[in-house]
Design a protein with these regions (language model features):
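Acidic, Ser/Thr/Pro
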Residues: 1-228
Length: 228
């Protein structure tokens, strides 16, 4: 099947945008300027209590961060999105909480600062949908968080992506997917430049990427051996 992209849908710098996908459709997230972190959340379109869960995803994949072929799973442990293509260096994050108003207060802001937590609702409200609760556990696309050699300490670093780098996520169920072009301009995460948040772009693809199959959950080897 050929890739039929929709016109680019811009996530304005520091703001949110959401899309509804049918199972088998894909969304491409484009780092237009090469420096922007994009937070991502997803929900079952028919049950907003079922949401994409980073904790359950790490158990399912046994990866700290996703690679092509990995699925993100929900709070009910069902695959919801699968990473089917990645033209970036593959540096993303599933650990850091999305920024919220309180985060910026702790960083010294005395006035309201745009944040990913509010952007989640901004994007979904454009679709007429209100998630039942806030979820700080986002998939942080293009964010560069490194585990240091002591295997304990995390380092928050600038992005290593290039202009036009992208990832593509395939919907495994009908779902809402929300994105935030992260407004963070205090902690240096937005590339090696002036840390200014920038636009990112989305494209909806009518392509199921059939060569990328959904993998089952990780199971300890002694259990898989016993089943043979």
């Amino acid at each position: 099947m050929s890739v039929i992209p929709s016109p680019a849908l811009t996530i304005p710098a520091g703001h949110g945008k959401a899309v509804r996908l049918k199972a088998g459709q894909s969304v491409r997230v484009i780092n237009t300027h090469g420096t922007q972190v994009v937070d991502c959340w997803a929900w079952n379109a028919y049950d907003l209590e079922e949401y994409m869960c980073m904790e359950a995803t790490r158990v399912w994949t046994q990866h700290l961060n996703p690679v092509v072929g990995d699925s993100f799973v929900t709070s009910a442990r069902h695959p919801i999105l699968t990473l089917v293509d990645d033209t970036s260096p593959g540096v993303h994050d599933t650990f850091m909480a999305a920024c919220d108003r309180r985060r910026y207060e702790l960083l010294g802001c005395t006035h309201y600062h745009r944040n990913c937590s509010d952007n989640l609702f901004e994007g979904m409200l454009e679709l007429g949908v209100t998630p039942p609760r806030r979820n700080l556990a986002s998939f942080n696309i293009f964010m560069n968080i490194r585990v240091l050699p002591d295997n304990i300490t995390l380092a928050t670093l600038p992005t290593v992506t290039r202009p036009g780098d992208s990832i593509t996520l395939r919907a495994e169920m009908d779902c809402f997917v929300a994105f935030s072009a992260c407004p963070q301009d205090i902690v240096n995460i937005q590339g090696e430049g002036d840390n200014t948040p920038k636009d990112a772009d989305l494209q909806i693809l009518d392509d199921a990427f059939p060569s990328v199959k959904v993998k089952g959950p990780w199971v300890p080897e002694h259990l898989t051996s016993a089943q043979r």
